[in-house]
Amino acid sequence: MKQPLFITFSGIDGAGKSTQIDLLCASMSAAGARVTRLSFWDDVVAFSAQRERSSHRLLKGEVGVGSPGRPVARRDKNVRSWYLNFIRSCLYLIDAVRLNIVWRQHRRRNSDVVVFDRYIYDELANLPLNNVLSRAYIRLVLKFSPIPDLPLLLDADPSLAVQRKPEYPLDFVHTNRQAYLALGKIEPSIKVIAPALIPEVQDQILKQLLALRAIKGQCPAFIAFLAASPIANSQAQTM
């Protein structure tokens, strides 16, 4: 039984992950691929509803998703203290265990591609990566966590990201972006997608997929949905 291709999308809030996931899943489905889309928060994270309620109650932040016409002042991952980092570290270990279970389940299911909206990387980027103990802990969790076939990190300009999704202070988003980039140096398999317009980001993702095809040429499902995609064919001819 052929195993599915695992693709993950990570990045700061407002980086455009949902847009690119929608576009990629739609194009792969149109090409005949059986695509499973998972939300790390909804499908992997342990006690997600309880954690959200507790965070709102204790940290007094607003709930909801921010939009240009409706800013939301969230207080959760942007609140930093040693005891919150300790609690997060404990919870992230549980999430890593859950991730392995979910990963094994979907390896055996009838899908060609499994796409994660966020991944364990998005949690680890909430920790202080400038701390030696935090980096050691992160390496431990990464060693224990499954490595996706294509882990994508969508980089973005923090100012534009906050305009698109006003939920956190700009200074925190700058700090969070640097944490993601630092995490990419700890885990070299992460592919950083440079900030750009939506079609240009699509092109960068496509190039990563085509490069992956060259490495995993033995994967029929992967080759099938790429070969059937008109966008992929035109891009391949220009590379």
Question: Can you name each region flagged by the protein language model?
Answer:
Residues 9:
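Hydrophobic anchor at the beta1->P-loop junction of P-loop NTPases
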Residues 12:
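P-loop (Walker A) phosphate-binding loop of NTP-binding proteins
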Residues 113, 118-182, 191:
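A glycine- and Lys/Arg-enriched "phosphate-lid" helix/loop adjacent to the NTP-binding pocket
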Residues 31-47:
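Short beta-strand-centered segment that lines the nucleotide-binding/catalytic pocket of NTP-utilizing
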Residues 17:
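Conserved lysine of the Walker
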Residues 42-129, 136:
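ATP-dependent small-molecule kinase phosphotransfer cores
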Residues 159, 163-239:
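NTP-dependent small-molecule kinase module
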Residues 20:
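Hydrophobic positions on the alpha1 helix immediately C-terminal to the Walker A/P-loop
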